[in-house]
């Protein structure tokens, strides 16, 4: 198992939790982004810069991830594609996407896209709360413990 991060929009606090977990457990952690992302100096932590462009980082994650890996991303279509490959997907708010929940999340996302396209202002996501940060860290710990890392 290794952890892949859709790092372009990943909050700094989430990256810090991931760096601590990777340092503590030795799990391989790769941040994928279309710009340089600084990472701690450790053999198991790296940053992968891809070309700028729509979904280039997402496509790289799909290509490189394997069944049993963990991807950190809030990108719902990416999560759906990864779940089909039996990759676990955890969003930065601590929600683990599953086969049972991803279809509903895709429907909500598509509905919001339709509203935005019709000119309705929907706003963006709220900043991460302390509760969500804690939930992310707890969920990550549960996943790593289950994998016995």
Curated annotation (Swiss-Prot):
The record ties this protein, via Pfam families, to: DUF188
Matching InterPro entries, A to Z? UPF0178
The source's domain of life comes to Bacteria
Query: Which NCBIfam families does this one have?
Result: PRK00124.1
The family note in this entry says:
Belongs to the UPF0178 family.
Question: What is the name of the protein in this document?
Answer: UPF0178 protein VFMJ11_0615
Source organism of this protein record: Aliivibrio fischeri (strain MJ11)
């Amino acid at each position: 198992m290794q952890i892949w991060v859709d790092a372009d929009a990943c909050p700094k606090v989430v990256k810090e939790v991931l760096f601590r977990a990777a340092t503590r457990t030795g799990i391989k952690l790769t941040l994928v982004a279309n710009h340089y992302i600084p990472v701690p100096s450790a053999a198991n932590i790296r940053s992968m810069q891809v070309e700028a462009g729509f979904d280039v980082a997402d496509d790289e994650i799909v290509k490189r991830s394997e069944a049993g890996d963990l991807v950190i991303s809030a990108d719902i279509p990416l999560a759906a594609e990864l779940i089909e490959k039996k990759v676990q997907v955890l969003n930065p708010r601590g929600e683990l996407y599953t086969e049972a929940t991803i279809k509903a999340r895709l429907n909500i996302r598509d509905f919001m896209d339709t509203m935005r396209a019709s000119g309705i202002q929907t706003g963006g996501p709220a900043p991460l709360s302390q509760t969500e940060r804690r939930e992310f860290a707890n969920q990550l710990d549960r996943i790593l413990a289950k994998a016995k890392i």
